[in-house]
Amino acid sequence: MVPVVALVGRPNVGKSTLFNRLTRTRDALVADFPGLTRDRKYGRAEIEGREFICIDTGGIDGTEDGVETRMAEQSLLAIEEADVVLFMVDARAGLMPADEAIAKHLRSREKPTFLVANKTDGLDPDQAVVDFYSLGLGEIYPIAASHGRGVLSLLEHVLLPWMEDLAPQEEVDEDAEYWAQFEAEENGEEEEEDDFDPQSLPIKLAIVGRPNVGKSTLTNRILGEERVVVYDMPGTTRDSIYIPMERDGREYVLIDTAGVRKRGKITDAVEKFSVIKTLQAIEDANVVMLVIDAREGISDQDLSLLGFILNSGRSLVIVVNKWDGLSQEVKEQVKETLDFRLGFIDFARVHFISALHGSGVGNLFESVREAYDSSTRRVGTSMLTRIMTMAVEDHQPPLVRGRRVKLKYAHAGGYNPPIVVIHGNQVKDLPDSYKRYLMNYFRKSLDVMGTPIRIQFKEGENPYANKRNTLTPTQMRKRKRLMKHIKKSK
């Protein structure tokens, strides 16, 4: 197995900054704001070809109440998961009682622990770390994570020797293969189309919705563990949490996102960052679960978020949560509202669930797989052209300036979402109603469910446009004789 490194410490000591530095990403939110990271966050890192998984955690300060108590629990769980712990302290703030409490807990776990003193930029490192020797964790490694100073030394003198002590693995590591695939997809390194197998890649599933609709509760229900912080307060999740998982022999990357509110209500800068992360997660996902609160109904913000999902071309599963406890009359009213406000989304499955009690959750993944398979299915040019021809035979394109629009052939233009490119004459003059007819015809013929279909039209070019035919000498002589004959006849 790939070794796991956990970053733990008080709030705002720079754990997320070091996480971003180690994973060479900006996946963890970073701001000068205590308690910003609330959930365990995983990332892939590498030292001289040796891979490891890095876990970013929320801070522990010993005064937790409410949601902060759950944050501390997440950090303690990360310690249990890890093979080695990087215990981070703030060199500028000095030794704090919470540092001593964390050190005591780490000593009791008997796990390899390295003490890292962050924020030493502008300080004398030797002088700044003196007080931390009283924690009894051995040598201290001074760094400035925001500038990268000391991080390379930390990798070379701490993590690399520790990893080299691990027994070498002769077999190919499944986790290493997974993260290699994950990184290749993130960097856009796609295989040749003929060799592409969508079933070989994990399905990225983003769970999105307004604040406090039950996204993290649903995530924990799916995973069967308290993996992300759940608290009855809007805005508990601030970052997008990427969680690898497997279900029924299929690999997934579950993305729990922050809730998205109306722009006018977002005043906290950290929340603005969280919304950006949510929108990026939608762009990054293969399938999006839009969670709606059955007790509050469909808001304009739900429709706005739905519009972003559709514009991104992502596959969609609509989840109506908190269905338990509603009277039959209220349920019928909710369904009528759904039909009225979401009637234009006729391709997405709608599930009525209770994430808290688990009812209906088991059926979600059937729709997720259906949507993913539909969005990545390869269809040949002959099949698409045949469907287009049948659509034209059933309903001819309209006349434009007395001439019939002619559709010649169709081919695939992309996947996730499926794109059909149709070539023809005067296609730019096709009315929107006929374009919708073609889109629905392709959807029904290809049995596409859970994903939007996009149709692009390309005008057929006249190969003789702007070209003049050059006459041969024989043709020139014939032309002269013809012109003489015409003049004589006049």
UniProtKB/Swiss-Prot annotation:
Q: Which residues form the EngA-type G domain?
A: 3-166, 203-376
The family database entries (InterPro entries) matched by this protein are listed as: G_ENGA, GTP-bd, GTPase_Der, KH_dom-like, KH_dom-like_a/b, P-loop_NTPase, Small_GTP-bd
Sites where the protein binds GTP 2 = 209-216, 256-260, 321-324
Q: Which GO terms describe its biological process?
A: ribosome biogenesis
The reply on keyword Nucleus is: no
Q: How does it assemble?
A: Associates with the 50S ribosomal subunit.
Annotated PANTHER family = GTPASE DER (PTHR43834:SF6)
NCBIfam families, per the entry: GTPase_EngA (TIGR03594), small_GTP (TIGR00231)
Q: What does this protein do?
A: GTPase that plays an essential role in the late steps of ribosome biogenesis.
**Protein's name in the database:** GTPase Der
